[in-house]
Curated annotation (Swiss-Prot):
One of its GO terms (molecular function) is 3-isopropylmalate dehydrogenase activity. Binds 1 Mg(2+) or Mn(2+) ion per subunit. The record marks 145, 195 as: Important for catalysis. This is 3-isopropylmalate dehydrogenase. It is an enzyme of class 1 (oxidoreductase). It is found in: Cytoplasm. InterPro entries: IsoCit/isopropylmalate_DH_CS, IsoPropMal-DH-like_dom, Isopropylmalate_DH. Pathway: Amino-acid biosynthesis; L-leucine biosynthesis; L-leucine from 3-methyl-2-oxobutanoate: step 3/4. GO terms for cellular component: cytosol. Keywords: Amino-acid biosynthesis, Branched-chain amino acid biosynthesis, Cytoplasm, Leucine biosynthesis, Magnesium, Manganese, Metal-binding, NAD, Oxidoreductase, Plasmid. It catalyses: (2R,3S)-3-isopropylmalate + NAD(+) = 4-methyl-2-oxopentanoate + CO2 + NADH. Pfam families: Iso_dh (PF00180).
Amino acid sequence: MKQKYRIAILPGDGIGPEVMREAYKILSILKDHFSLSLEIQEFNIGGSAIDQEGIALPKKTLLGCQNSDAILFGSVGGKRWDHLPINERPERASLLPLRKHFNLFANLRPAKLYSELQHLSPIRSNIIKNGFDILCVRELTGGIYFGKPSDRVKKNNVEYAFDTEVYYDYEINRIAHLAFQLARTRKFKVCSIDKSNVLNSSILWREVVEKVSKMYPDVHLSHLYIDNATMQIIKNPNQFDVLLCSNLFGDIISDECAVITGSIGMLPSASFNEKNFGLYEPAGGSAPDIAGKNTANPIAQILSLSMLVRYGMKLNKIADKIDDAVALSLKAGYRTADISNDNNFLKTNEMGDVIANFLINGK
């Protein structure tokens, strides 16, 4: 790790500031107990930035992110700003421009089922008795969401719309390399998702992935069509390790993997560019309905910080300790409202304190 690691903190809207406060506790421990040299600066973004500065992504925020080594992001958006034109709303006008500006082409979404929380999964207990730990690797800047032409047309009293799925071989190549590299840190398995029996873009996808796989002979590669993959995840999620997906298919698959864990409040995510600059954020939204009530689950935000430590700072052992602190908290029976079966649950700040204590003491 470099001598001083600079992190831009963007709490955002809704529950973002609340759960970010708990991440700050972990950051303090990293500095005080693990002697990490961190430079932390907080910046405004999203709806709160619109309210205060008239724009969702202020220049000061963008500059602060540019001068940092990583971004720890909270959440943006809420009904309060739904009256704005869609392209000026917090989600469209802050997070998407950040991804574009830094060319964050790869999105990682872990989906892990903790044994203590199996009862929350919508999947039958006999299917998930052995748990699962899946990492979705999604290409984020290509595919049908960005392909041209894309339009909606009304002509001769007939209306039609069209989008274009476009993938270049280099886009597939770089995301495939990342998936195989990550598989080497896990169970050495990659399953690539496509629709190569129908789509030309998927035929190219499969060909490039096959070519890349030859550079990783120790990693087992399999392929599934997207329709079969969605079924297999429900039937036996434990069979998967790393899922390699295009933008559209990754959007679908990562949400499916998330929902079968039982609580999206547990799930972190990370997005990278080719220089390993990353944006780390919870997979869930801003949850404005519970904002300010001190009931949000801070685990996704804390695990997002863990991903920053693991992938950004390359400090796997310290990231493992953060992950272990979360696991120990759950094993000891501590719960927030979203993962509790009764009214005996912890507030957001209390859960953060518990995890912080386990991180310091290790038991």
